[in-house]
Amino acid sequence: DYPQVNGIQSLREKIATMYEGTTAENILVTIGASEANTLVAAAMLNPGDNMVRFRPTYEQLSGNASNLGFEVRSVDMIESNDWALDTDALKQAVDDRSGIIHVVNPNNPTGRILSQSDRDAVIAAAASCGAWIVADEVYAGTERDSDEPTASFWGDYDRVIAINSMSKAYGLPGLRLGWLVAPVPVIEDC
């Protein structure tokens, strides 16, 4: 028998326990985070939309969006301020056509974990235009500054898609097991 295309039920149930307020129906198992990024770019951006990303960053989702013909806007992080977000530049970058604000947290390549005020600024920017926050969280759990893993964006705003995998924090890149966490209609669209 072939497995379920959205992931085996018991696996989706286990992943759901990592995200408060989710069920297996909020989880889509993917071939690594790479497939999750590809699915999100294809399903969540509409003609005329743009995507906002922070730099430096892991470029896969923005590359997917660009390859599909979408405008990718960049907000440079402030290196002299420990890679903090430029919240003023973020406010200028978003508009009513911003479909996605992409966040890699902890950041790749800087390792920067967003402060609560930076997280709040991302949420406020997304809420101001109805954008989805797509949070690449594959490095959550690799932190060395604290015993607490970086908090997920999931549950902080109603339009969040969290992406994770077994590659980084779990040290199993060859397994090619990733997932996305999202509202059920998004899971169905992906």
Go through each PLM region and give its residues.
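A short helix->loop->beta-strand "cap" motif at the edges of active sites that frequently abuts
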Residues: 49, 70, 128-131, 158
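Hydrophobic residues in well-ordered beta-strands that form the structural core
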Residues: 53, 74, 102, 133-135, ...
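Conserved PLP-anchoring active-site segment centered on the Schiff-base-forming lysine
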Residues: 43-65
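N-terminal small-domain helix-loop-helix segment of the aminotransferase-like
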Residues: 1-35, 39, 89
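Short strand-turn motif at the edge of the Rossmann-like AdoMet-binding core
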Residues: 56, 137-139, 166
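Conserved core segment of the aminotransferase class I/II
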Residues: 156-190
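Short acidic capping loops at alpha-helix termini that bridge into adjacent secondary structure
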Residues: 23-27, 47-50, 97, 158-159
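Active-site phosphate-binding strand-loop segment of PLP-dependent enzymes
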Residues: 79-148
